[in-house]
Amino acid sequence: MCIRDRYKKLPNNHDKVSLIEKLQLDIPDLYNSYNLKQRKSILEDLKNRLDYMDNYHEDKGNNNWQDWFKNKQWIFGSDVVQILDKRRTDYNNIYDYIIKSYDGFVDLIEIKDPKINFWAQSKDHNNYIPSVDLTKAITQCANYIHCLEKRINDKDIAVEIGNILKPRCTLVIGRSNNWTEEHFEAFRILNSMYHNINIITYDMLLKRAQKLCSIDSSET
């Protein structure tokens, strides 16, 4: 029986009010449950894509990585509240994603291929060092931040995308599913070198999002 028919069959106003009050309590719970189910399905899709990552490209072809992350801002964490449609703030640079953080300021997300080698093939003085491709990606992020900061007093840009103040960039690149403890130590040291760039692998992104969904599930 649909809600409308159920409402009509109620004998008195008191019962009708009780039904309305119950629905007002249940609808948010139903929405949260549905939303959580959708997110878990998306994370399962991400896991499958990583299992068959040779079938997908960074920014070319159908269903590439940059396209896949559109409209999935929640996967980058609770700090990200919106992925903006605008990707260009000048003639020279096209950003993967310009995002608005929870504090209203603008940050960046750069999506690279998970197939990229994170570490160089050989160590330097017995230390793991970034691969050439990772170094290039970090340099690109630093350049994007610099170019964005130059527009900090541009009122037109502020109207279009929001406030620019000490922008940060999240770089999603490579895999860490087969790392050793030594790799993770090197990763922590590498990330500590950059104040406005946060490097994260696809596996770390997936694991963090799964943990967020697990927390949400325990609260519903």
Cite the ranges covered by each PLM segment.
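Short, small-residue-biased leader/transition segments that mark boundaries at the very start
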Residues: 1-3
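Interdomain/boundary linker segments immediately adjacent to catalytic/signaling cores
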Residues: 7-59
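Acidic-basic catalytic patches of nuclease active cores, encompassing PD-(D/E)XK
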Residues: 49-90
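Active-site metal-binding core of divalent-cation-utilizing nuclease and nuclease-like domains
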Residues: 79-107
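Conserved catalytic cores of phosphodiester-cleaving nucleases, focusing on short active-site segments
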Residues: 97, 105-120, 144
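A solvent-exposed, charged loop/short amphipathic helix patch at secondary-structure junctions
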Residues: 114-133
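Polybasic (Lys/Arg-rich)
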Residues: 174-220
